[in-house]
């Protein structure tokens, strides 16, 4: 799997993400980006390629993961302000205990959020239903910080 990031630099997140995808795809395959379609559940995918991708953007950055396996990626600016009351709606009881004990609860909530979004993108289901039914850890190795953002990447 390869991951790339860039600043938006006047582009929309969509434009920057697609440019990253095209650059990664060309670097890996030597080919132009194949046609992209959206599944009935809303997940973008290539029409005729064995490669998979996931794109995320924040107000300042775009990120793209390209893999031979199904992949889901999400990112949030690490300094983003987030309503801590959201924890009651999206965290499982196990996650809530970790959140309550965290030194930096905003960062903890953003970490759980990107994990849940990355998992939703991986499955292609989105966050429909009950995000508080999943259990993640603040120590999850699929979370990293890159370019001032908290990033979660999951791969099947």
Residue ranges of model-derived segments:
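Core catalytic alpha/beta fold that binds nucleotide/phospho-ligands
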Residues: 1-156
């Amino acid at each position: 799997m390869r991951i790339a990031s860039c600043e938006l630099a006047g582009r929309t997140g969509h434009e920057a993400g697609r440019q990253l995808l095209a650059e990664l795809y060309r670097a890996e395959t030597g080919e132009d980006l194949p046609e992209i379609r959206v599944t009935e559940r809303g997940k973008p995918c290539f029409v005729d390629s064995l490669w998979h991708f996931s794109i995320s953007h924040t107000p300042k950055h775009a990120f793209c993961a390209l893999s031979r396996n199904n992949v889901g990626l999400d990112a949030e600016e690490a300094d983003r302000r987030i309503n801590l009351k959201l924890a009651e709606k999206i965290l499982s009881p196990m996650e809530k205990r970790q959140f309550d004990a965290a030194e930096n609860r905003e960062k903890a909530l953003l970490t759980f959020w990107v994990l849940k979004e990355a998992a939703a993108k991986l499955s292609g289901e989105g966050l429909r239903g009950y995000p508080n039914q999943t259990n993640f850890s603040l120590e999850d190795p699929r979370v990293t910080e890159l370019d001032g953002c908290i990033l979660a990447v999951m791969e099947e």
